[in-house]
Amino acid sequence: MLRIGKLNLSTMSSAQQRLAQVGSHLTAQKQSLAPQRPYKITVIGSGNWGTTIAKVLAENAGLRPHLFQHQVDMWVFEEKINGVNLTEIINTQHENVKYLPGIKLPKNLHAEPSIVKAAEGADLLVFNIPHQFLPGICKQLSKATLKPHVRAISCLKGLEVTPNGCKLLSTYITEHLGVHCGALSGANLAPEVAKEKWSETTVAYRLPNDFQGHGKDIDRYVLRAAFHRPYFHVRVIEDVAGVSLAGALKNVVALGVGFVHGLNWGDNAASAIQRFGLNETIKFAEVFFPGETNQDTFTKESAGVADLITTCSGGRNVRVAKAMAITGKSAVEVERELLNGQSAQGIITSKEVHELLAAKNLTKEFPLFEAIYQIVYGTESIERLPELIEEDE
């Protein structure tokens, strides 16, 4: 007499037997996806986006004890707020009063001032820092004893430019720490996500060559369970290069939108800048990462056109560029006045992109990216932007 669990198949119709078998298979599959022990999550970074992502992860860790350890660690660069350590404030008041004020954080989110202590024992490292700090962060993390099969997700926006080309920051993490790394990017303004206003994002992750198996290693199921919330919907794809490039280059485009807003040129001009920017982003991917990206990532995913639209509708880069246009001040001056110690990533990314294009003699192939660089760092005026990017018939 054949049984599945407590079910007696001999007393069932063929259709009922098939349903029972399928249900049993799905139950076994679900159980196989549960890890042998809960995964530990650590967030590297505690700015407004870093703290927001840590909030999301801690909420899910609290809800899914079969998958994740209850406590999520967040590495915080220690600083004093009215004479009190920021980590102490976060751990006692459950609020990042400097970078995400007014948002209550889960009690299982623990602020840790030691980056080595925060990283050791982690199964998943989530990097969320200004990208120019990554080399120093990796140098510090090289002193930590990381788990043999720790995995990572990069929420960083930028590129590593070398004389020979450019690398994804996820690749930089892998090369310097030996940690397989994916990427997260999407139409996600941190204050809106922190306030639990509905949005979506894209996680890009390919299974590593040394994948240990479901239930033993981080996979798409685990990543979606870690990041997906009712107010923060997640799609997991494999195009790490496309997601990373879209996340980096949209900040350069947003500077252009900020410039035209500062001159009160209107929505038509802002839309034109975004069209140029999307086209140059796709072209950049084709030139520097041939065969590694999927054009659908730029046109159909949250990490692509949706993030471009959102970033160009507000955010740091637009604010900084708009203030530059209105006041005539430099990017450095405006950043210092507006951003409370944070940075507009488009400023440094535009310089990195220019250096790469100049080294490859390709500046004329990317007129918008080059024009924005020349306005920020060179002698060009914002008023000449239409002339600088004008297309031939």
UniProtKB/Swiss-Prot annotation:
GO terms for cellular component: cytosol; nucleus. Pfam families: NAD_Gly3P_dh_C (PF07479), NAD_Gly3P_dh_N (PF01210). It catalyses: sn-glycerol 3-phosphate + NAD(+) = dihydroxyacetone phosphate + NADH + H(+). Belongs to the NAD-dependent glycerol-3-phosphate dehydrogenase family. This is Glycerol-3-phosphate dehydrogenase [NAD(+)] 1. It comes from Cyberlindnera jadinii. NCBIfam families: glycerol3P_DH. The gene is gpd1. The active site is at residue 250.
